[in-house]
């Protein structure tokens, strides 16, 4: 009986350990793989601040370019492409969460006017589906269908992202109007430097937290360093922890000042934002314009014919 209880206890402990390990793996894996949109979605109700700044810039500190291309004008209830380009040197490698080097991922947030939204699959043409590839877009919030996020996705394959967008129809949507609208975009390549809680990632520079002499540098077994800084006046010691990834700039015995860089800046990525304008065009206005242009063409043709007729009359009178 005692043996059976012992085996039962061991079985429960093993099961509990496996469950905890799986939970940790899932949580950490999710936080790494879904870092870009998840951090913004969890921390901010709206990704664009009142100043016009997109909140991704709070974690991705380096400024890099991004480009967006949309049609100049679209008709109501029409599917069109919004192409976001996130350029970078494909040969670059970034510091991963485990300190190793790897390829860069990219991510983007697209802020559309109210009423514009992600096109349903049955409205997307085969040609557009081919451009989209295996990308999966999601709404920033269930109630904010006009704000779309994507990423992280492999940068080598998706440095150009095609969003399939459906324009609103003012005939059925009273909040939509035939106007010129702004579109905002933010795009990043690579990991961020700061987490939303304010802590640094291992993809940034680490500075000294005290002035003194570096008395000891210990390289950790799993990577990273412990740097002991000793105050030359009172002997007080401060230990700075460097995670795996950044390379050291300092050595033992070196004098150092407060906020002096201890490591290089390993970041090779960055964030950029841009904007574009699009006109929701009234079909009746287009028809009116076409009618006006057609009337001008016909008027020109009529004048040419009248001129030729007049010339013929003049020639006949001269011959007479």
From Swiss-Prot:
Keywords: Chloroplast, Electron transport, Heme, Iron, Membrane, Metal-binding, Photosynthesis, Plastid, Signal, Thylakoid, Transmembrane, Transmembrane helix, Transport
Annotated transmembrane regions: 286-306
Compartments (UniProt record): Plastid, Chloroplast thylakoid membrane
Sites where the protein binds heme: 36, 56, 59-60
Cross-referenced InterPro entries: Cyt-f_TM, Cyt_f, Cyt_f_lg_dom, Cyt_f_lg_dom_sf, Rudment_hybrid_motif
PANTHER family for the chain: CYTOCHROME F, PTHR33288
Family stated for the protein in its record: Belongs to the cytochrome f family.
Protein name (database record): Cytochrome f
Organism: Gossypium barbadense (Sea Island cotton)
């Amino acid at each position: 009986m005692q043996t059976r209880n012992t085996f039962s206890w061991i079985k429960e402990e093993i099961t509990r350990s496996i469950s905890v390990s799986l939970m940790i793996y899932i949580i950490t894996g999710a936080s790494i793989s879904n870092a870009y949109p998840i951090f913004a979605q969890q921390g901010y109700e709206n990704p664009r601040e009142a100043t016009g700044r997109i909140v991704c810039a709070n974690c991705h500190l380096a400024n890099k370019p991004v480009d967006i291309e949309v049609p100049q004008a679209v008709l109501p209830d029409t599917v069109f492409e919004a192409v976001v380009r996130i350029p970078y040197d494909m040969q670059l490698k970034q510091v991963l969460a485990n300190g190793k080097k790897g390829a860069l991922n990219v991510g983007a947030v697209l802020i559309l006017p109210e009423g514009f939204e992600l096109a349903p699959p049955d409205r997307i043409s085969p040609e557009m589906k081919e451009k989209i590839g295996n990308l999966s877009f999601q709404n920033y919030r269930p109630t904010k269908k006009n704000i779309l996020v994507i990423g992280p996705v492999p940068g080598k394959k998706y440095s150009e992202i095609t969003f399939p967008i459906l324009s609103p129809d003012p005939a059925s949507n009273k909040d939509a109007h035939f106007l010129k609208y702004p579109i905002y975009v933010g795009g990043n390549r690579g990991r961020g430097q700061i987490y939303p809680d304010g802590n640094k990632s291992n993809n940034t520079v680490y500075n000294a937290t005290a002035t003194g002499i570096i008395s000891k540098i210990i390289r950790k077994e799993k990577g990273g360093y412990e740097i002991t800084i000793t105050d030359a006046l009172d002997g007080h010691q401060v230990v700075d922890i460097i995670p795996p990834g950044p390379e050291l700039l300092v050595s033992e015995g070196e004098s150092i000042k407060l906020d002096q860089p201890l490591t290089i800046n390993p970041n090779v990525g960055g964030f950029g934002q841009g904007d574009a304008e699009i006109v929701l065009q009234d079909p009746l206005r287009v028809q009116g314009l076409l009618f006006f242009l057609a009337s001008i063409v016909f008027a020109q043709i009529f004048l040419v014919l009248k001129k030729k007729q007049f010339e013929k009359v003049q020639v006949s009178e001269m011959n007479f």
